[in-house]
Each structure stands twice: as C-alpha cells, then as structure tokens.
Amino acid sequence: LFYTSLSPNHLNVYIDVNHYYADKKRALFFIKNNEIYFINNLDNIIGIKDNQFEIKIDFIKEIKKYLQGEFSCKYANIAMNYCLNKGFSKEELLNRLITLKPVKYRLNKVFENKQFIFINDSKSTTSNSSKYCFETFSDRPRILILGGKHKSNKFNIKINDNDLVLIYGIDKNIINKEINGLLFNNLEEIMKYIKTLKNNYYVLFSPGCDSHDQYKSFIDRGNHFNELINIYFKYE
C-alpha cells in the first residue's frame, strides 16, 4: 500500500512544484507490485489494478487511543482496512494497534498539569500543519507557538478571543503581519511568559516554519521544547 498527499507544502526544498510532483512520482519505483493507491484526500481513493478496495470496518474509535489528529487516525483506518482486504483478521489488527507509535514530535502530548496541556508538534514546518494542530485541540483555550524561518505559504488560522499566539525567531515580524501575536526572541522567553499566565490552556508548539534559524533540525527544536517544560513546569 502506497498513499500520499499531493499538496505542495514543502516547496522550499524544490525548484518548483513540477519538481515536487516528480519527486513524489519517483517513490513509485520502489513499489514491487501493481497494487498502488494514491490518496489525495480522504474522500478520493484512486486504485490502480485492484479496484476492489473498500472500508469494511471503522477502527477510528480504537485508533484514537493511540494516535492524535483527525488525518492520522483516518490514514491509519485506511491502512487497517487495506489489510482486511488482504486477509488479515480484525483481531490481528486490533492487537497490532498496541504497538502503534506516533511520529516523533507530531501532535505529541508530552506533559500535563492542572493548568496546561503541552503538545509538541515540532515537526510542523508549514502553516497548514500548524492550522491542523490548532484545530485538532479545541476544547479549551489555546496558546499557539509559531516561529523559525518563514516559508512562502501564509498563516491563515482563525484565532478566538481567548486564544494566544506567541511568535519567536528570525522571521517573527513577517509572521506577525499574517497572524497577529506577541513577539519574543526565542523559545525560552516564551516559556517564561507562559509561566506567568493564570488561565488553563493547551500549549501548542507547532512552529509552522523551518527550524534552522536557531536549531539543527525539528528534532533538536522539539527536544529543546521538552527540556524547557522540564525546567519551568515539570518540577514545580
């Protein structure tokens, strides 16, 4: 099973959109049979050769015990139903769910106390992924942390009156023109500010930008976020 989105969110590493699509196409050369499925959106499953794919069982409720995020759960549901079509039993697949691990720093809940729930989404390098994170956690006020090297795609996120946007990094002024927030030089300044707040919040670290202005990678950035949680919140 091969599935991918065809949304050009990472054009900063490509010459243009045509090179982006060509790179996606090259992945097909690693498929060893002709049973290939493209998923460009969740309502449009395009099959090649074997066009009998169908969603037989909705595993979403079980999947949500192990994964965060609407699309992550729906993609996992599609993969599990593909396996059903290939002869795996429902019991086998449910047993495998126990071993399912989320992608590192993609919507990871890393700490919770009486006031804050911290979500580490450092893998977020586009405005679309920040928007997805923001909309995934919506049952309490949210603090959205953005920052880094801004890409060409603009931030188009609807912020409520009880939400906060905190922006840091080299392109904080550019980001602030697209989504108004409070400006900081670095992530540690933001964590110190959050420490002064009194209300209950989700703290969503979903930068929506490239990490290389202050970090080696999104993993380095995510590690630093966790370290700051330990320093300022975990041992209160």
Regions found by a protein language model. Give the residues of each.
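C-terminal helical cap/extension that packs against the catalytic core
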Residues: 150-202
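Short glycine-rich anion-binding loops that position phosphate/pyrophosphate groups of nucleotides
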Residues: 8-9, 42-43, 125, 148-151, ...
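Nucleotide phosphate-binding/pyrophosphate-handling subdomain across enzymes
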Residues: 63-163
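Residue-level signal for inorganic ion chemistry
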Residues: 1, 20, 75, 79, ...
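Glycine/aspartate-rich loop-and-adjacent alpha/beta segment that forms the canonical ThDP
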Residues: 207-235
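Short internal beta-strands
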Residues: 2, 37-41, 145-147, 161-172
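Active-site regions of enzymes building and remodeling cell-envelope glycoconjugates
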Residues: 1, 45-65, 162-165, 177-190
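Flexible active-site lid/hinge loop adjacent to a nucleotide/diphosphate
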Residues: 1-50, 60-63, 213-218
